[in-house]
């Protein structure tokens, strides 16, 4: 099988496509023929060695994949069945999806929902799955379309752009925040009623004028602090990212004076039941136009160069890897 293998030499990460024997695949009860994978920011960090994502080498990256079951010792899955996988540390500490085959635990797989195929599943990927979990978190907190505007930070990224599309389809008024002016028209086409520049969120006081009924934050740091200070009474912020940094220079004021909820959202270890629910919702709630968005299709051998481009903020939209 062909695979993108990451090896370490003199402290540097080297990425190359190699032919490997299936016997080298890690332990697991289901072997999958991978048809499509994708390149996420986390994959790009791993492939370029820019982030300490991978501790053990050699490693096959790829935190998402979709394909058909080759062999299964898990009664829930049978040969020929279409499946997808996101998260669970695959592509980080267990060989991942940037290979013609992957062997994983059945618990980590999701049967392909009706109305979805492998390519569409990878257009959604971890980014879209995380966005759906954030929307569900706002719903669970009682945030409704009639309550007011929802702000989405880091809106031109994978999670943010999907969140904008989902919220718009569900009837919410969406305001997008993006540091890239070139993406403003794109965000409006996804459903944002207006787009604010990120530098408006640089500094904040402990409490500011109430503006937002809900928020999905992918940035962290000062941007998240500003959003918290501007939340309506009883509002909820779903926080899922740290594109701007992992610190949070806030105070207790929004929480104790405005009853604001800060809800963390993790997509890696989401329990199977919630996971399946989110994928069903994605099929139902994503507009068909979402799948026609800019999605670059590349081969395994092109992945290292595209990983570099993703790190340098040169790619808009999804990067799909056609594996088989």
UniProtKB/Swiss-Prot annotation:
<dbReference type="InterPro" id="IPR014188">
    <property type="entry name" value="Acrylyl-CoA_reductase_AcuI"/>
</dbReference>
<dbReference type="InterPro" id="IPR020843">
    <property type="entry name" value="PKS_ER"/>
</dbReference>
<dbReference type="GO" id="GO:0005737">
    <property type="term" value="C:cytoplasm"/>
</dbReference>
<dbReference type="Pfam" id="PF08240">
    <property type="entry name" value="ADH_N"/>
</dbReference>
<dbReference type="InterPro" id="IPR013149">
    <property type="entry name" value="ADH-like_C"/>
</dbReference>
<keyword id="KW-0560">Oxidoreductase</keyword>
<dbReference type="GO" id="GO:0042803">
    <property type="term" value="F:protein homodimerization activity"/>
</dbReference>
<keyword id="KW-0521">NADP</keyword>
<dbReference type="Pfam" id="PF00107">
    <property type="entry name" value="ADH_zinc_N"/>
</dbReference>
<feature type="binding site">
    <location>
        <position position="267"/>
    </location>
    <ligand>
        <name>NADP(+)</name>
    </ligand>
</feature>
<dbReference type="GO" id="GO:0043957">
    <property type="term" value="F:acryloyl-CoA reductase (NADPH) activity"/>
</dbReference>
<comment type="subunit">
    <text>Homodimer.</text>
</comment>
<feature type="binding site">
    <location>
        <position position="198"/>
    </location>
    <ligand>
        <name>NADP(+)</name>
    </ligand>
</feature>
<feature type="binding site">
    <location>
        <begin position="156"/>
        <end position="159"/>
    </location>
    <ligand>
        <name>NADP(+)</name>
    </ligand>
</feature>
<dbReference type="InterPro" id="IPR011032">
    <property type="entry name" value="GroES-like_sf"/>
</dbReference>
<feature type="binding site">
    <location>
        <position position="41"/>
    </location>
    <ligand>
        <name>NADP(+)</name>
    </ligand>
</feature>
<comment type="function">
    <text>Probably catalyzes the NADPH-dependent reduction of acrylyl-CoA to propanoyl-CoA.</text>
</comment>
<dbReference type="InterPro" id="IPR013154">
    <property type="entry name" value="ADH-like_N"/>
</dbReference>
<feature type="binding site">
    <location>
        <position position="313"/>
    </location>
    <ligand>
        <name>NADP(+)</name>
    </ligand>
</feature>
<dbReference type="InterPro" id="IPR036291">
    <property type="entry name" value="NAD(P)-bd_dom_sf"/>
</dbReference>
<feature type="binding site">
    <location>
        <position position="242"/>
    </location>
    <ligand>
        <name>NADP(+)</name>
    </ligand>
</feature>
<keyword id="KW-0963">Cytoplasm</keyword>
<protein>
    <recommendedName>
        <fullName>Probable acrylyl-CoA reductase AcuI</fullName>
        <ecNumber>1.3.1.84</ecNumber>
    </recommendedName>
</protein>
<dbReference type="InterPro" id="IPR051397">
    <property type="entry name" value="Zn-ADH-like_protein"/>
</dbReference>
<comment type="similarity">
    <text>Belongs to the zinc-containing alcohol dehydrogenase family. Acrylyl-CoA reductase subfamily.</text>
</comment>
<feature type="binding site">
    <location>
        <position position="256"/>
    </location>
    <ligand>
        <name>NADP(+)</name>
    </ligand>
</feature>
<feature type="binding site">
    <location>
        <begin position="178"/>
        <end position="180"/>
    </location>
    <ligand>
        <name>NADP(+)</name>
    </ligand>
</feature>
